[in-house]
């Protein structure tokens, strides 16, 4: 079905080949990724990318912070099209006016700086970008990790907010030329197999080994031609879960048809690799052999075919329960009781967001459910189309009526089920979702209060088949139905009537509308000569997600108030983290004011003259995790640590480039350890890093440190900070990206 080959390959006239007339070095310049990147690279050095994007997108969890950063750094107008969507609208059951206050800030910013403002429930961020911004050969940057428009010929990248602030300040996205991995598609999917099935199988094959980490996936092969554009988009958006950097697909008449339908045929052009192209690795996918899939908690890679899962449900669900008990000691997870009456029964089905709520997915779900009923039991079925234009078309062709008659509920365009702000299941509920992620607590449960819910990812087709059986988990291939092909018609009337198009029309006289919850960033201090950090969280999970570092859902209500948001840092994984970090921050504040705490003096005395070191040693908190940063691009995963006085992450490997970049932009030192180095220390132990400022200035990558344990023992530890650019060094020295720009503006 899917095979990964950890060796280079030529694509020679569309065929895989071990040899070719060109050298690998010559042929690598014929990949689509190379061509698009070089067209946007202003460095003059193809190995050192300095990219300027064609457009940007942000949603309402992130755009306030980005605009505040750019404003504080001297921005006067948006220099490129920048769409502000409101699809993470939290509906604010808590917080009073703060949700709509953020939206009004966004509208006033679009008017002041010349942006595009998409009101709440008009579209989810990635649907709007596909419909209105993507174009063949373009590059788009988004402050959301699922910024992926490769199937439309657009290389798109999801990054933390500071990278978008840099673009607003007319600076560049700086990365070494990434490796390019060929994804070669053959065959045609069978009826009942949808894009999420292919995507989940791809994530399963690549995630655990990091096979495509920080690479560009380039989709080619004869299997593309039979895939509708929504099918391609549905696979493409999930490439984020492989931890790849970006993606790009060959384009054809199907792609051209998309742009014609959306009134933008000028944004289409054929994209193909050159006659001979070289790839660093390759993956083959036989689409005709893909089966309906299910991804169990707590990651899209924890996947099985649905048939395999059903045949081994008790064993698999017991494993999930054991994992949940280890992660959430206050919860009492029970999923094996879903096995009864000859099947496995779910409590909820959801089709939503940038992966699930696509027109074709919902239309085929309606085909499956036409004339059937979801039942009057516990099982519920909710459908969220990606945009109002998609909702209009579904209504016009009758799919909406079919779904409503079956017992489904049609909801507005909203990302809520994907980030814990909508359709939170009952305690010990089992939810089937065609959304992007099933990370711990991402569905909105609160394990600190004894709650647990399990989310399984499935394709819309199999969720609809399950709904037709009253919640009994069923692959769509088991049902006899006839999918009806519908020619999609895009009606942009609503966008023309409701979206504010302000690019190129900045009005400096407009005042930003600031609600009481919208606050400035607290002062951040430059890096001192020495650094002492107390371990406020030590996490030995294989991977730590950004959703664990800073939960989403109702927490996002405080997205525009750094101090209030920071109170939720690691709250669902290490509830003691905030208190520990704040205690350290208080001691650091006292130190700056000349009052050194007994605790700080005692720790410093283990590594030198405490009085002398106290004047030159910054004291902060740190997080240790094996592999932090998988998942969301939200910068808050790093900024909240810094607001609480965090100065370092220590790990064996960062899960994603974007999280490491977020740490650097907020002045958090991205320390790594050599694989195999034991780290048996506990929260409350301290790490002393002498001469850290000098080490960063000089670009030293091997940095000796001392661990001071609570029992008074001292141990050597070798830390690394590898591959910093000149700008990244300066950002760390200044304390954060905003300080860096403030200093540049004074020069």
Q: Language-model segments: which ranges?
A:
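Fe-S-dependent hydro-lyases/dehydratases of central metabolism
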Residues: 1-747
């Amino acid at each position: 079905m899917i095979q990964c080959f950890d060796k280079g390959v030529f694509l020679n006239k569309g065929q895989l080949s071990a040899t070719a007339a060109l050298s690998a070095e010559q042929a690598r310049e014929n990949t689509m990724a190379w061509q698009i990147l070089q067209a946007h690279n202003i460095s003059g050095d193809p190995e050192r990318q300095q990219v300027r994007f064609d457009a940007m997108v942000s949603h309402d969890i992130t755009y306030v912070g980005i605009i505040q950063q750019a404003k504080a750094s001297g921005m006067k107008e948006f220099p490129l099209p920048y769409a502000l969507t409101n699809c993470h609208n939290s509906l604010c059951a808590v917080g009073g006016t703060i949700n709509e206050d953020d939206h009004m800030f966004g509208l006033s910013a679009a008017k002041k700086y010349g942006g595009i403002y998409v009101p709440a429930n008009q579209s989810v961020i990635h649907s709007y970008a596909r419909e209105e911004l993507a174009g063949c050969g373009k590059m788009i940057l988004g402050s959301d990790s699922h910024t992926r428009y490769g199937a439309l010929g657009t290389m798109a990248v999801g990054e933390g907010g500071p990278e978008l602030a840099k673009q607003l300040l007319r600076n560049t996205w700086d990365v070494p030329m990434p490796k390019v991995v060929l994804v070669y598609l053959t065959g045609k999917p069978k009826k009942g197999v949808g894009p999420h099935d292919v995507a989940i199988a791809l994530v399963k094959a690549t995630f655990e080994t990091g096979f495509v980490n920080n690479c560009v996936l380039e989709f080619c092969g004869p299997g593309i031609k039979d895939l509708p554009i929504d099918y391609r988009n549905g696979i493409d958006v999930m490439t984020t879960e492989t931890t790849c950097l970006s993606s790009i697909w060959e384009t054809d008449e199907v792609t051209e048809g998309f742009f014609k339908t959306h009134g933008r045929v000028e944004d289409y052009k054929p994209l193909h690799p050159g006659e001979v192209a070289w790839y660093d690795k390759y993956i083959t996918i036989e689409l005709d052999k893909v089966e309906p899939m299910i991804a169990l908690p707590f990651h899209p890679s924890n996947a099985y075919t649905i048939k395999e899962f059903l045949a081994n449900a008790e064993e698999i669900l017991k494993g999930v329960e054991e994992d949940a008990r280890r992660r959430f000691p206050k919860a009492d997870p029970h999923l094996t009781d879903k096995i009864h009456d000859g099947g496995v029964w779910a409590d909820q089905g959801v089709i939503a967001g940038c992966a699930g709520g696509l027109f074709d997915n919902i239309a085929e779900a309606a085909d499956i459910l036409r004339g059937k009923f979801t039942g009057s039991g516990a099982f519920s079925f909710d459908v969220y189309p990606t945009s109002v234009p998609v909702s209009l078309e579904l209504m016009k062709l009758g799919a909406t009526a079919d779904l409503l008659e079956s017992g489904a509920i049609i909801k507005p365009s909203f990302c809520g089920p994907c980030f814990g702000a909508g359709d939170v299941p009952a305690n010990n509920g089992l939810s089937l979702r065609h959304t992007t992620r099933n990370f711990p607590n991402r569905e909105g449960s609160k394990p600190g209060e004894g709650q647990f819910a399990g989310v399984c990812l499935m394709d819309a087709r199999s969720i609809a088949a399950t709904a037709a059986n009253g919640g009994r988990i069923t692959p769509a291939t088991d049902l006899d139905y006839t999918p009806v092909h519908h020619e999609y018609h895009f009606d942009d009337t609503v966008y023309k009537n409701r979206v504010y198009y302000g690019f190129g029309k900045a009005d400096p006289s407009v005042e930003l509308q600031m609600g009481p919850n919208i606050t400035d960033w607290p002062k951040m201090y430059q890096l001192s000569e020495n650094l002492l950090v107390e371990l406020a969280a030590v996490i030995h999970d294989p991977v730590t997600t950004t959703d664990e570092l800073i939960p989403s859902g109702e927490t996002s209500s405080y997205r525009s108030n750094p101090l209030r948001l920071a109170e939720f840092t690691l709250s669902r994984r290490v509830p003691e983290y905030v208190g520990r970090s704040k205690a350290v921050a208080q001691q650091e504040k006292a130190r700056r004011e000349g009052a050194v705490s007994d605790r700080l003096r005692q720790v410093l005395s283990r590594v030198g003259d405490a009085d002398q070191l106290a004047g030159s040693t910054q004291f902060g908190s740190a997080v240790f995790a094996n592999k932090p940063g998988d998942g969301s691009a939200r910068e808050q995963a790093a900024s909240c640590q810094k607001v609480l006085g965090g100065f370092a992450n220590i790990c064996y490997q960062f899960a994603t480039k974007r999280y490491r970049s977020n740490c650097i932009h907020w002045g958090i030192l991205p320390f790594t350890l050599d694989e195999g180095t034991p780290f048996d220390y506990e929260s409350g132990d301290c790490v002393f890093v002498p001469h850290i400022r000098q080490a960063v200035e000089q670009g030293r990558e091997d940095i000796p440190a001392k661990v001071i344990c609570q029992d008074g023992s001292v141990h050597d530890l070798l830390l690394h900070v590898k591959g910093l650019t000149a700008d990244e060094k300066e950002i760390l020295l200044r304390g954060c990206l905003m300080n860096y720009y403030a200093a540049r503006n004074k020069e």
